[in-house]
UniProtKB/Swiss-Prot annotation:
Binding residue positions for dimethylallyl diphosphate: 106, 194-195, 234, 251, 260
Function: Catalyzes the sequential condensation of isopentenyl pyrophosphate with the allylic pyrophosphates, dimethylallyl pyrophosphate, and then with the resultant geranylpyrophosphate to the ultimate product farnesyl pyrophosphate.
Enzyme class: transferase
The encoding gene: FPS1
UniProt-annotated location(s): Cytoplasm
SUPFAM superfamilies: Terpenoid synthases
Protein name: Farnesyl pyrophosphate synthase
Organism of derivation: Kluyveromyces lactis (strain ATCC 8585 / CBS 2359 / DSM 70799 / NBRC 1267 / NRRL Y-1140 / WM37) (Yeast)
GO terms, biological process: farnesyl diphosphate biosynthetic process; geranyl diphosphate biosynthetic process
EC number(s) recorded for this UniProt protein: 2.5.1.10, 2.5.1.1
Positions annotated to bind isopentenyl diphosphate: 48, 51, 90, 107
InterPro entries reported in the protein's UniProt record: FPS1-like, Isoprenoid_synthase_dom_sf, Polyprenyl_synt, Polyprenyl_synt_CS
Length: 349
């Protein structure tokens, strides 16, 4: 485990204790406090923690530190708490998403609602994971001049993510295939709202507020790169689900059988002949590996892989141009954005 990740994980137990103390202060019985603690520990720290860690990394960069190790203990704890607030937001979304999708496993363990005795209580547990964000922000940031900015940022990004989720759920229900509902424009809206805001913009905006870079022009400079970057990231994900090697991506792609409104199917629909369209209409979104292969054959006929590689190079080039024109006069740093782009450009997993 990387040192950065280990140091970040060390902060979490103290936050769980603070949340326990809040419940105890309300006179909550111990069994309920233990339930909440179990939910926090089961659902929050298990992932890659990329979003949370990038708050810390971005803050260090904006403040001019050579590495995270140069932060004082107090400074580190503060930005790590903001990072953990994103991880709590992610946990809240995932617990709810897994119920909506009737998923079985998440991060190599049973989904929370599938754990013995949890079931539908997971709905309330999801709400309580979201509530934890605001408990922690109040305790640690209430006296900061940017406190209201943090609250608005979390509220706005949460609602934007839910809007993306709504459009996704009504566009591509697993049990009712209707490809006429799909389009590249709709796909773009879904991925920007469902993924880009909370996975890319949120971490950088939080680090900016903590570092005192709060001019709306700088927040706009960040979002103007990070939102299209987040869209590019999700398009990569869609592409890899279909064309990535299972040994690279660590899973077998299921988007075709799951009727996902993915970039791949939308590009195919845009370019398909009448015959190819009929094949996709009859075979996409069916739990049948032969039908999946028929879709894949159409994707190959349409040279989706070539279209993707052209898209990737054009997008990366556009983003690099935007980054080159960043105005750093108020303390924002283009390097933050370069690091994000370099992490995902040409990724295989």
């Amino acid at each position: 485990m990387s040192d950065n990740r280990a140091q970040f994980l060390e902060v979490f137990p103290s936050l769980v204790q603070e949340l326990r103390d809040i419940l105890a202060g309300y006179g909550m019985p111990e069994e309920a406090i233990e339930w909440y603690e179990k939910s926090l520990n089961y659902n929050t720290p298990g992932g890659k923690l990329n979003r949370g860690l990038s708050v810390v990394d971005t803050y260090a960069l904006l403040k001019g530190y050579k590495s995270v190790s140069e932060l004082s203990a107090e400074e580190y704890k503060k930005v790590a708490i903001l990072g953990w607030c994103i991880e709590l937001l992610q946990a809240y979304f995932l617990v709810a998403d897994d119920m909506m999708d009737q998923s079985i496993t998440r991060r190599g363990q049973p989904c929370w609602y599938k754990v013995e005795n949890v079931g539908d209580i997971a709905i309330n547990d999801a709400f309580m994971l979201e509530g934890a964000i605001y408990c922690l922000l109040k305790k640690h940031f209430r006296t900061e001049p940017y406190y209201v900015d943090l609250l608005e940022l979390f509220h706005d990004v949460t609602f934007q993510t839910e809007l993306g989720q709504l459009l996704d759920l009504i566009t591509a229900p697993e049990d009712k295939v209707d490809l006429s509902k799909f389009s590249l424009e709709k796909h773009s809206f879904i991925v920007i709202f469902k993924t880009a805001y909370y996975s890319f913009y949120l971490a950088v905006a939080l680090a900016m507020f903590a570092a005192g870079i709060t001019d709306s022009k700088d927040l706009k400079q960040a979002s103007d790169v990070l939102i299209p970057l987040g869209e590019y990231f999700q398009i990569q994900d869609d592409f890899l689900d279909c064309f990535g090697k299972p040994e690279d991506i660590g899973k077998i792609g299921t988007d075709i059988q799951d009727n996902k409104c993915s970039w791949v199917i939308n590009v195919a629909l845009k370019n398909a002949t009448k015959e190819q369209r009929d094949i996709l209409d009859e075979n996409y979104g069916r739990k049948d590996s032969e039908k999946e292969q028929k879709c894949r054959a159409v994707f190959n006929e349409l040279n989706i892989q070539d279209i993707y590689h052209k898209y990737e190079e054009e997008t990366a080039s556009n983003l690099r141009e935007k980054i080159a024109n960043i105005d750093e006069s108020r303390g924002f740093k283009a390097e933050v954005l370069t690091l994000f782009l370099n992490k995902i450009y040409h990724r295989k997993k």
